[in-house]
A protein has these predicted regions:
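Primarily the internal scaffold of c-type cytochrome electron-transfer domains
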Residues: 2-12, 29-82, 91-379
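Intrinsic low-complexity, intrinsically disordered regulatory regions enriched in Ser/Thr/Pro
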Residues: 17-18
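Active-site neighborhoods of enzyme catalytic cores
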Residues: 86
Length: 381
């Protein structure tokens, strides 16, 4: 810890331990007196960055985690213990009470948010500017952006620059080039995490498909009426809820693409990715409707954890039946890869890890539903 700090800009500028941790901890007997730094403490010197951060989606990561309908069912070591979801979602802003509770459970380390990217105790700006700073969290089943980026031409060129193969001035964007342009810490995207938005599109078929997906997310009830969960999702900024907000983020990304590409190319690539979402939505909506039909016809019994007799995509791996387990993977793994791979310039991910898997999923879901309707016993987890 001390050696890291000695090599940091903080050390050079005279920002010592007491500036961040207070002056009440001065021996091993007073460890409990050390203050846990929060973004507000960083804001004393880095006010602009903290304000930007609070306007972005990273600041809402902890609240988003807590809002998931089956959060309370998970092993606490995974959540508050930071060994699962909490390990990345800890970047989000936490209340004083939440920090106190985390401290009781030994999960107080790394709750400062800023240190998720500027790791302690170097707190290096240069570190946080590298794409590898994003790798720990933006990888894996539902958001493999690192895998997509690092094997795309964007990523390959930058990694070759890091290795000295390409010249220093070679064009090669990082995650930060596109998502944190100019060092802006207010990270947001037009389509959000789950690639839905409001208002509904003019395309009637796509509008119907998106309505079905919103029902699956619990934002609408089975009859199409808005639910309390929609209010929560809006508050957490999970997706854009006005055309103006969506357009603002699209224009920002378009301007980023224009730093290297022509307007026609940049616009065309973004619009092709939009169309990939539309195609993926068609398959996912059909799958949701198939499972919803099983609930409607009482072939599946409503889970005690569900608000309605309707599949809940946000139940994730706690989905109660085998067919819903397949649906959850179709949504969280394969649809994500279809549209994320497209936006991250990785055709292999968009096709073989995404779209191809969705086609297989819908084929299996149709067969599983037919078996259930033909009287074969459905497996409940």
């Amino acid at each position: 810890v001390v050696e890291d700090w000695k090599q940091s800009k903080h050390s050079q500028k005279g920002v010592d331990c007491a500036v961040c941790h207070g002056d009440k901890h001065y021996s091993k007997e007073t460890v409990d007196k050390a203050e846990v730094p929060r973004p507000e403490r960083c804001g004393y010197c880095h006010g602009t960055q903290v304000k930007q951060f609070k306007d972005g989606k990273h600041a809402k990561a902890w609240s988003s985690l807590k809002a998931m309908p089956t959060f309370h069912m998970q092993p606490m070591a995974l959540m508050d213990g930071m060994k699962g979801c909490g390990g990345c979602h800890k970047i989000g802003i936490k209340t004083d009470d939440e920090v106190k509770e985390l401290r009781k459970q030994g999960g107080q380390f790394g709750v400062a948010s800023c240190d998720s990217c500027h790791t302690r105790h170097l707190f290096s700006k240069k570190e946080a500017q590298q794409p590898q700073a994003c790798q720990t969290c933006h990888m894996g089943i539902d958001h493999p952006q690192w895998e997509m980026y690092s094997s795309s031409k964007h990523g390959v060129r930058y990694l070759l620059k890091q290795n000295g193969v390409l010249p220093e001035r070679a064009a090669a964007p990082t995650c930060q080039s596109c998502h944190m342009t100019g060092g802006n810490h207010g990270v947001r995207t037009a389509w959000g995490f789950v690639a839905v938005r409001l208002p509904l599109p003019e395309d009637k078929k796509w509008a119907a498909d998106r309505t079905t997906i919103l029902k699956g997310l619990g934002a609408l009830d089975p009859s199409g009426k808005e639910t309390a969960r929609l209010g929560v999702l809006k508050e957490l900024d999970v997706f854009r809820t006005t055309q103006e907000d969506w357009q603002k983020e699209r224009d920002r990304m378009f301007a980023n693409c224009r730093q290297c590409h022509s307007p026609n190319f940049a616009r065309g690539e973004l619009e092709k990715s939009d169309r990939m979402i539309r195609e993926a939505d068609r398959l996912l909506a059909e799958a949701i409707e198939i499972v919803a039909g099983l609930y409607r016809d009482k072939i599946l019994a409503k889970s005690q954890y569900y608000a309605y007799p309707y599949p809940d995509l946000l139940a994730f791996h706690d989905a109660p039946t085998s067919i819903e387990q397949k649906l959850y993977l179709m949504f969280l793994e394969h649809r994500m890869r279809t549209f994320q791979g497209s936006f991250h310039a990785n055709p292999d991910y968009a096709l073989w890890y995404g779209w191809s898997k969705m086609v297989s999923d819908i084929t299996e879901i149709r067969k599983m539903a037919a078996d259930l309707r033909n009287g074969k016993k459905g497996k409940r987890r």
